[in-house]
Amino acid sequence: MAYLTQLRPDIQALLLSAFYFKGRIMSIQHHNTPGQASVGLGLRREMLDEFCQQVPSAINFFEVAPENWMILGGKFGRQFKQLTEQHAFFCHGLSLSIGSPEPLDSHFVQNIKRFLDEHNIEVYSEHLSYCSGTGHMYDLMPIPFTDDAVIHTAKRIKQVEDILERPFILENVSFYAAPGAQMTEQEFVNAVLQEADCKLLLDVNNIYVNSINHQYDAAAYLAAMPTKRIAYLHIAGHYEEEADLMVDTHGADIIDPVWALLQQCYQIHGVHPTLLERDFNIPKTDILLNEINQIHQYQQNALTQQSILRKA
């Protein structure tokens, strides 16, 4: 930049600021935009010490629930900031209650926005469910599959996007009853996405769990999801309570039928960033990497197959 010395001091300062700003933006874009063929892991506090030393190269991004991190200070807060400055992060909320009959908690959404801004996180998703009525419930309840609920939920989604100044991504959830349903789950999910014009976090394990519990064809449900709206994927393990009752726990290894459904998803919808969820019975990182590397392998297999088909 020797040529800068030939310019007026005020022009030098302006250009240097521009170079700095461009570099900062490129840095943010680099560590916050994993490619389509990428695999992430849900970050938990017990992982901080290890990952602040070194993050395995197989982990392309992390995901956190902002509610668990946005008031965190001290050592954990410093470690978290260190990681968000160096690695890509997605946020997946727990308590927005997008389908609630109560007014939207705009103060809470503003707090989410501040957290996202502070850590340069652009991806924010939530559950297509609700967890508040006359008070806060400590579980995610299914929104009634009705036309009125579609319109109500879509209106709230647009409110959230206006506050966040970011696209809002909705996840298909596991559920165990559907009172008052006027349409199927897949029809409801598609209707909300269309009405709100928003993206989908497609949870492959939830499709499998619901297909067993409600006796529908998981492959048909998967095929009915809108490819162009898929932002990224979740995959996890679950607990088999009975042969016809699965519980979405994120506390076990992924089983073969769910792996098969993930491969079908890549074949039907293409490869998307895929996050491994593990919330309970968390094994050592070496064990988690077995599943992370399995996802990488399935992504590469799908990309290879797509390349062959394009050349045929």
Model-predicted regions and their roles:
Residues E161-L245:
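Acidic/histidine-rich catalytic cores of soluble enzymes
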Residues M26-R114:
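N-terminal pre-domain/capping segments
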Residues D105-L200:
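Active-site acidic/histidine proton-transfer and metal-coordination neighborhood
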Residues F62, Y124, D203, L233, ...:
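Conserved, mostly hydrophobic/aromatic
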